[in-house]
């Protein structure tokens, strides 16, 4: 299981399938991003929304469509928030039903470069960028670097507290030792 660090439901499904078929289960964890002193760290989408509700300025949300509902309780969210999500028809429709439409709904497939993240922050005059700590594979550092370059505050939603598994290096060693690879 090398899924996204926030894909808890997928991980449960994989683990259950392995248990049901008596197949060994191994999880490979993405390395967390580097700590950034100028960022605001929060434990959940709700805490991020509460924090942002006390601020002024536009916000680029890069957390994905499944998290958007947690931001709809914010004052003036339809004018302040710019949501970047996958450009799938069902995703765009679900976002529109939450009130994210027009220029406030950006449909694209990532990960994105620092330059493209910075261009979006400038285009929408965003003072904040909200992201999950997706690690290098999720373009995390490029988002943080772009935010800092644009004088936007990165708001980072921490990973689930209980992550079990092994690093990529540990996984390679394990596979070599146990499967003669």
Task: Describe each PLM feature range.
Residues 88-91, 153-165:
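Short, flexible loop segments at boundaries between secondary-structure elements
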Residues 27-28, 84, 156-158:
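Generic beta-sheet signal
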Residues 57, 64-105:
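Anionic-ligand binding region
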